Every structure is written in structure tokens, then in C-alpha cells.
């Protein structure tokens, strides 16, 4: 809520918003934007996994690590849907952290769950020192190519955004 007395302060070409408590509301805006970005990432990834579970093929060949030229595992429809559900849950946790569910669940619960998400994605970015992550063994597979250029950096970005989201928590 903006302060009724003054509301905004224009200094150096930058508008600063202050809440009634005097705290800059710009941090709240930044947190909301970060939350929306995280929710979109999780929602998009969830939809992609649902697409794969429904039989979609686009990008699927690059989604599973390979060992010796063969897929390291064969994801089943149920495990793919489980991953989609986990990503959808992460999206809902971020929405909860933004206050979209009111006071139904204590805000600290969403903070702890967001921390768990951040740590999970950090572990994924680091990897298993074998097939996935920044510290994987060198490979010329399609998965390794995309893991180095997209998957692991995205996991690290999600981690950093989640930590900033937590840091800016009111």
C-alpha cells in the first residue's frame, strides 16, 4: 500500500515507492516479478512434461541423458506425469509465496518450501558428476549439449531467483 502522504519520491530520474511502514515497495515489485518469472518457468516445464507424457516427441530425445549411446533410463508415462505434478506444485508454492492464497497456509510454510525448491534445483545444476549437471563427464550426446547450454544454467537461474525471492520476503 502506498503512503498517502507523498506516495512517491522522484530523485535522480528514479521513482521510489514507499509503503505505509516506510519500506520501499520497489522490493515488493521486484519480488512479484521474480515470483511470476519462477511460476512461468515451473508452469511451462510442467506443460512440457505433460506433452511428453501424452506422447509428444518434440525435444524428448534431448531430455534424457545417455550412457554409451543408449538412454540412461526410459521415462515412463507415470514418472513423467509425476515430474509434471512436482513442477506444477512448485508453481503453486511460488504463487502461495506471492500471497495468492491469502492466509490459508502460513507464509513461513511457503518460504520453507521455496528454500527446498531452490536447494533441489541447485543440486540438479551441480549434477551427479556423471551424466547431468555442470560437473558431468564430457559427452557428445544431444542431452549433454543441451544440459551444458540450457538445462543446468536454467536450474542455476531458478536457484538464484528463488533465493532472491526469499530474501525479498516481507
Predicted regions and their residues:
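Core segments of alpha-helical transmembrane spans in multipass integral membrane proteins
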Residues: 40, 55, 67-98, 115-119, ...
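Transmembrane alpha-helical segments of integral membrane proteins
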Residues: 126-138
Amino acid at each position: 500500500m502506498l503512503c498517502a502522504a507523498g506516495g512517491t519520491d522522484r530523485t535522480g530520474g528514479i521513482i521510489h515507492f514507499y509503503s505505509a511502514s516506510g519500506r520501499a515497495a520497489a522490493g515488493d515489485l521486484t519480488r512479484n516479478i521474480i515470483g511470476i518469472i519462477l511460476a512461468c518457468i515451473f508452469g511451462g516445464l510442467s506443460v512440457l512434461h505433460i506433452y511428453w507424457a501424452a506422447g509428444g516427441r518434440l525435444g524428448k530425445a534431448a531430455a534424457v541423458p545417455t550412457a554409451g549411446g543408449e538412454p540412461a533410463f526410459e521415462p515412463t508415462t507415470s514418472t513423467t506425469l509425476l515430474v509434471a505434478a512436482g513442477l506444477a506444485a512448485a508453481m503453486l508454492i511460488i504463487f502461495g509465496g506471492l500471497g495468492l492464497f491469502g492466509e490459508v497456509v502460513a507464509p513461513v510454510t511457503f518460504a520453507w518450501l521455496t528454500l527446498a525448491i531452490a536447494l533441489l534445483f541447485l543440486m540438479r545444476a551441480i549434477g551427479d558428476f556423471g551424466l547431468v549437471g555442470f560437473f558431468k563427464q564430457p559427452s557428445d550426446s544431444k542431452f549433454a549439449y543441451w544440459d551444458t547450454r540450457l538445462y543446468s544454467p536454467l536450474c542455476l537461474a531458478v536457484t538464484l531467483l528463488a533465493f532472491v525471492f526469499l530474501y525479498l520476503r516481507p
